[in-house]
C-alpha cells in the first residue's frame, strides 16, 4: 500500500488463475481507499498512455513507493535457481513459456528477456506508466555482485535516510 499524491491509498497486486486477469500473464491491478486499512475498491490496472494494459516483461509481485511525489513501481520474477536458461533453450521451450507468461517467442528469446527485477515511474493517477521499464538487477548474474543472490520474486522497496533498499526473495529463497 502506498499513499498517492492525492492523499488516497493504493494497493497493487497481481491476480492469478484462470478467473483472474493477471498472474504471470496479465497486468498489475490497482485498488484505492481513503484510509490505509481498507475497504479497498478496484480501480483498474496499470496501463500504458494509450490505455492498453502495461505488460512489459513479466508483471508480478508489485511494490510501490511514493518518493517525494514521484511514484515508482517495482515488479518482476525470474526462473528459480537452476532454471536460468541459455538463449537456445529459451527458444526451444518458447511455446510453453508463451502459454505460461502470455509473451511472444520474440519477447522470450530476446535480450534482456522477460524475467528480472524492473521499475517504472507512474503518473499521478497511480495507474498510467510515465517512463520506460528499466531492469534494475541483471538476469545473468555470473561475475556480478548479485551472483550469489540472483533475483527471484517478491519486490519490496524502502528509502531510509536517503538511501534506497530493494528487498527481494533470491533464487536461493533467502
Regions found by a protein language model. Give the residues of each.
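Carbohydrate-active catalytic/glycan-binding domains of CAZyme proteins
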Residues: 1-174
Amino acid at each position: 500500500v502506498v499513499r498517492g499524491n492525492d492523499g488516497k491509498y493504493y494497493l497493487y497486486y497481481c491476480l492469478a488463475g484462470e478467473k483472474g486477469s493477471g498472474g504471470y500473464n496479465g497486468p498489475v491491478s490497482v485498488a484505492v481507499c481513503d484510509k490505509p486499512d481498507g475497504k479497498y475498491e478496484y480501480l483498474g490496472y496499470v496501463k500504458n498512455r494509450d490505455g492498453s494494459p502495461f505488460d512489459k516483461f513479466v508483471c508480478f509481485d508489485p511494490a510501490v513507493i511514493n518518493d517525494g511525489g514521484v511514484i515508482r513501481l517495482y515488479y518482476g520474477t525470474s526462473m528459480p535457481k537452476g532454471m536460468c536458461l541459455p538463449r537456445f533453450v529459451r527458444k526451444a521451450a518458447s511455446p510453453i513459456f508463451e502459454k505460461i507468461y502470455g509473451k511472444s517467442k520474440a519477447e522470450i528469446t530476446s535480450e534482456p528477456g522477460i524475467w528480472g527485477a524492473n521499475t517504472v515511474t507512474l503518473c499521478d493517477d497511480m495507474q498510467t506508466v510515465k517512463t520506460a521499464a528499466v531492469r534494475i538487477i541483471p538476469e545473468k548474474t555470473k561475475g556480478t555482485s548479485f551472483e550469489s543472490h540472483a533475483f527471484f520474486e517478491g519486490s519490496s522497496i524502502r528509502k531510509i535516510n536517503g538511501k534506497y533498499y530493494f528487498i527481494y526473495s533470491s533464487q536461493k529463497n533467502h
